[in-house]
A protein has these predicted regions:
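A short, well-structured alpha-helix characteristic of acyl/acetyltransferase catalytic modules
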Residues: 1-38, 154-157
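Acetyl-CoA-dependent GNAT
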Residues: 12, 31-80, 95, 152-156
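Conserved acetyl-CoA-binding loop-helix of GNAT-fold acetyltransferases
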Residues: 82-95, 118-122
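Short glycine/proline-centered loop/turn elements that form peptide/ligand docking sites
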Residues: 85, 89, 113-116, 132-138
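Conserved GNAT acetyl-CoA-binding A-motif
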Residues: 98-108
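Conserved catalytic-core motifs of GNAT/GCN5-like acyltransferases
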Residues: 106-109, 126-142
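Conserved active-site tyrosine of GNAT-family acetyltransferases
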Residues: 120, 125, 149
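Terminal substrate-recognition subdomain of acyl/acetyltransferases
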Residues: 140-157
Length: 157
């Protein structure tokens, strides 16, 4: 699978790219919001101008009564604020709606992650509510709130 956005390409993480993604997820600006995963299997690499600059993943609820999907994403600090994360989320969201038939998508950034929230709003995600003490900050051990955001298929921009 390879998905092309305006500026990024999303494709399965290739052998050896886990080391690159591990370095990215440990950058202070990324580590503030992401715990390093055990591995990057199942994630899609975000590629910009031939360079892996982050990763995006999705999970699906396939029960026809609740056919929706969720998205998680991280991007290297030096490429944040350039629209690449927005492009990656929009590209994956379009595929989840058109190819996989999902009618609703969710994303749940830390409530304090204002840059991510701004980016997701550009794709069409709307705040639904605060999930209190949703995730533990892996650096401090403190619980932090998350903002649940969702997007219906016809709201995708």
């Amino acid at each position: 699978m390879e998905l092309r956005g305006d500026d990024v390409v999303l494709r399965p993480v290739a052998d050896g790219e886990g080391r690159v993604l591990d370095r990215i997820v440990r950058e202070p600006e990324v580590a503030a919001w992401w715990s390093p995963p055990e591995d990057f299997a199942g994630m899609l690499a975000i590629v910009f101008e031939g360079e892996v600059v982050g990763a995006i993943q999705f999970y699906e609820e396939t029960d026809p009564e609740f056919h929706h999907a969720g998205i998680d994403v991280f991007l290297t600090a030096r490429h944040q604020g350039k629209g690449l994360g927005t492009d990656a989320v929009r590209t994956l969201a379009r595929w989840l709606v058109t190819a996989r038939g999902h009618h609703r998508l969710t994303i749940d950034p830390a409530a304090a992650n204002t840059a991510a929230i701004r980016s997701y709003r550009k794709v069409g995600f709307r705040p639904v509510g605060i999930m209190r003490a949703y995730g533990r900050d892996h650096r401090t051990g403190r619980w932090q709130d998350a903002l649940l955001m969702d997007l219906l298929a016809d709201e995708l921009t």
